[in-house]
């Protein structure tokens, strides 16, 4: 098993591995090109994103600056929006569903380091995958830690630090992030009424 295979499977691996470094630098070059042209040449920026990401649906919008490690381990669905300063450390797979919105400075970290300093000082790292369901809104300055799953239809309050997985259909917030309540029919009625009033 090579270092890339170890990395993607969640085993300890050497991030300094030459093949991984080549992939990392290639991704950084694409990220730099994307950030430079995102507002001046949308077609070129979209093409760069298609080359950078592992897969991407339709209607993808990422505000620069954007940062990631490899890009190829990031899969996003349709109608994805990420605001400024999004950071995705994708040493493992990051699966993002459709109709997902990320506020400014949202960080998704699959990367982790050993607690034992002797192992850590050898340059060994590991990762855990992250998944985000459909119709999720993650507020600004949220940190999603390695191995987290966020269920579909969830709303995450700004400034949250997610250390445990979040179920679907809830509002969650805090440091550490905790479920505050379920999203219910009253929420739907309220926001549909707001939408109706807007059209008057």
Task: List PLM regions with ranges.
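Terminal amphipathic alpha-helical/low-complexity segments used for targeting or macromolecular assembly
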Residues: 1-59, 177-200
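Short conserved AdoMet
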Residues: 54-57, 133, 149, 167
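Short-chain dehydrogenase/reductase
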Residues: 137, 155, 171-173
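Short secondary-structure boundary/capping segments
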Residues: 4-5, 52, 98, 122, ...
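A contiguous, mid-protein "functional segment" used to position or interact
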Residues: 161-182
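Flexible, glycine/small-residue-enriched loop-and-beta-strand segment within the central core
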Residues: 39, 66-76, 81-149, 175-176, ...
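Beta-rich strand-turn-strand
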Residues: 139-165
């Amino acid at each position: 098993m090579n270092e890339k295979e170890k990395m993607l499977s969640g085993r300890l691996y050497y991030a300094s591995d030459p093949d991984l470094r080549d992939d990392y630098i290639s991704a950084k070059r694409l990220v730099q090109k994307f950030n430079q042209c995102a507002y001046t040449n949308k077609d070129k920026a979209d093409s760069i994103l298609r080359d950078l990401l592992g897969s991407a649906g339709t209607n993808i919008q990422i505000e620069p600056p954007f940062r990631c490690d490899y890009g190829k381990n990031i899969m996003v669905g349709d109608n994805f929006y990420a605001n400024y300063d999004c950071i995705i450390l994708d040493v493992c797979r990051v699966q993002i569903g459709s109709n997902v919105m990320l506020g400014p400075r949202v960080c998704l970290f699959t990367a982790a380091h050993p607690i034992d300093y002797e192992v850590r000082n050898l340059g060994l790292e590991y990762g855990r995958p992250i998944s985000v369901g459909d119709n999720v809104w993650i507020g600004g300055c949220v940190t999603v830690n390695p191995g987290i799953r966020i269920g579909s239809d969830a709303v995450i309050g700004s400034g949250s630090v997610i250390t445990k997985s979040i179920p679907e259909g809830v509002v969650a917030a805090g440091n550490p992030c905790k479920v505050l309540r379920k999203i219910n029919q009253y929420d739907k009625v309220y926001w549909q009424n707001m939408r109706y009033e807007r059209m008057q």
